[in-house]
UniProtKB/Swiss-Prot annotation:
PANTHER family according to UniProt: PESCADILLO - RELATED, PESCADILLO HOMOLOG
Protein name: Pescadillo homolog
Region annotation (Disordered) ranges: 452-562, 579-604
GO biological process, one term: maturation of LSU-rRNA from tricistronic rRNA transcript (SSU-rRNA, 5.8S rRNA, LSU-rRNA)
Source taxonomy: Eukaryota, Fungi, Dikarya, Ascomycota, Saccharomycotina
InterPro entries on file: BRCT_dom, BRCT_dom_sf, PES
GO cellular component: nucleoplasm; PeBoW complex; preribosome, large subunit precursor
Major localisation: nucleus
Family from the record: Belongs to the pescadillo family.
Coiled coil feature spans: 468-522, 573-604
Compartment annotation: Nucleus, Nucleolus; Nucleus, Nucleoplasm
Function comment: Component of the NOP7 complex, which is required for maturation of the 25S and 5.8S ribosomal RNAs and formation of the 60S ribosome.
Source organism: Scheffersomyces stipitis (strain ATCC 58785 / CBS 6054 / NBRC 10063 / NRRL Y-11545) (Yeast)
Domain BRCT as annotated: residue spans: 349-448
Amino acid sequence: MAKIKKRGVSGNAKNFITRTQAVKKLQVSLSDFRRLCIFKGIYPREPRNKKKANKGSTAPVTFYYAKDIQYLSHEPVLAKFREHKTFAKKLQRALGRGEVSDAQKLEANRPKYTLEHIIKERYPTFLDALRDIDDPLNMLFLFANMPATDKVSHRVTKEAEKLTNQWLAYVAKERLIKKVFVSIKGVYYQANVKGQEIRWLVPFKFPTNIPTDVDFRIMLTFLEFYSTLLHFVLYRLYNDSNLIYPPTIDIEKLKGIGGLSSYVLQSKDQGVSALLPQDKKIVEDDVSVQGKELSTANISKALEADNEGEEHEEVEQETVENVELDKFEASATKTAVDSLVQPSKYASPTSTLFSKFIFYVGREVPLDILELCILSCGGSVVSEVALDDLKTNSPDAYKKLDLSNITHQIIDRPKILQKVAGRTYIQPQWIFDCINKSELLPVNKYAPGETLPPHLSPWGDAGSYNPEAEKVDQSENAEEEEEDEVDEDDEDADEDEEDEEEEDEEEDEDLKAQKELELEAAGVKFSEIAEKEKKAAKKASKKRPAEEDEEKELKKIMMTNKQRKLYKKMQYGIDKKETRTQELAKKKRKIEKTKAQLDKLSKK
C-alpha cells in the first residue's frame, strides 16, 4: 500500500512562499527585501489555489516563487545589505559614545555595492537592454524635471538631468527622432535606435506639486537601477558612433541657456555660424571643458562589463568605424541623366527633412522641444535668447551676423508687428506634423493667427475618431467619379457589346412574359407572387438582427460570471468610444457649417 502524502510538502504549498517567510529566510528588513526584488526583477505571484499555497489559511498574503527566493539568497548585494546593517549599528554606537574619530573612520569605510553584475544577468545582450529602455527613460525624465525636496535630493535630480541630456544629445547627433506628439501629459518622442523603436515621455517644465501619497523610496530604488542601466547603454551607443563618453560640456552655455545646447556643441553654433559671412566667420578655439571625468577604476569596470557583454551576444556585430562614404563619379562621356546617386549616411527621409533650413525660435516658444526636433531632422537653430546672450557678451560677433540667411521663424503669437522679408512665419505645430508625416507640409495652414489643424497622435487607435477620415472618403469619391467618367468614355467604344447584352435582356423579358402566361393559365396572379416575395424579404431582414441578438444572449448564458462581467466592461468601453466619436463628428460638422457661413458673410 502506497504511503499517504503529508500535507504541505508538494504542489502549491511547496512552490510558493509568503513574503513574511521570505524576509525571515533571507534575514533582511522588509525595505531591503523590496529593494533586492526590484534590482533582480522578482515580483509577487498569484497561485491558482491560495488556500493550498497558504497551508489552509485564507488570510490575504503576498506570495513569491520559492525558487526565486532561493535565487535571491545567493545574491552578493544581499551580503552588502547585511554589512550595511552592521555598519549602521557600529556608527550609531560610536556617535552615542561621542567617539567622533571612530565614527569618521567608519564613515570612510562605508560598505558600497554595485549593480553591474545584475545588469549583465538581466540583459545578456545589448538589444535586450535597448528593448527595455522605455521605462528607464520615462523615470529619469520625470526626476530630471522634479524640484529637489526633503525626500528627493538635489544630487538625484542633477544626475537624472545629466543622463537625460546625454541621451538627447546622442539622439539629436544621430538624427534618430521619427515621431513626436505633444499631449497634456508632456511630449512623446519615438526614436529608432539600432533598429529598435523606443518611445518615451518628457514632462513639460512647469512648476510641479509633489504628491504626498507617493512612496519615493520605491521610486528611488527603481531610479538607482535605471541610472546604472542607462549608463551602460549610453556608453555602448557613444562608442559605437565613435563619440567620447561622457560628452564634453560648454560651461558658458551651461550657465546661460543650458539643456541640450550645452551638450550638443553644434546646436547653437551651427545656426549662428550659418548666419556669418563666408569670408569672415568667427574662428573659435576648439577648447571646451570636459564633463565629469570617470575615474580609471570606473572606466576599467565599464570596459570589462562591455567586453563580457559582447561574449554573450548571439550575433557578432562588426566594429563601427568613422569612415566617410565613398563618392562615386560618373565617367565624362555620360550625360546628366546617368549621374550616379550618392550614398547617404541617413537613409530615413525624416533625418534630412530640415537640412536646408535655418529656424529662428522666438523666446515665447519652448526651445528644448523644438531644438531636439529640428536638430534631429538636420536643421539649424538660432534662438532669440541665444542672440540676446551673444549681443550682451560679444557685441562685435553679434554685429557680424547675417540674419538674411534665416528661412523660417517659429512664433507662438496671434499677430506679428514687423515681418522680415524672405522669412516664412510658422507656428510650432508645423514642425511636429512634418516629422510625423515625413514630408514638408504647406505652411499656409500654420501661419500665425490661423486655426491649426488637429494635432493627432501618430500611434492613434484604429477604432478612435479620425477627423481626416472624411477627407480620405471625399478623395476616394472623387477618384470614383473620375473612374465613372473614364467608363463613360469607354462606353462609346463598346457599343457592339451593349447591343449583345440588350438582346440577352430581351430574351429574359420573353421568358418572364411566358412565365406570367403560365401562372395566369393556372389561375394565379403574378403580382400576388411578387408581393409575397417582398413580404418574405422584409420578414427575413427584420428577423436577422433578432436572431443575432438571440445568439448573443445564448453566448452570454454559456459564459462564466467573470467572463460576463468582462464582456459588459468591454461593451461599455466600445459604446462610450462610439458615442464620443459621434459627438466629435457632430461638433466638426457644426464648426465647418459656422465657418462656411462666416466665409459667405466676409465675401459679401
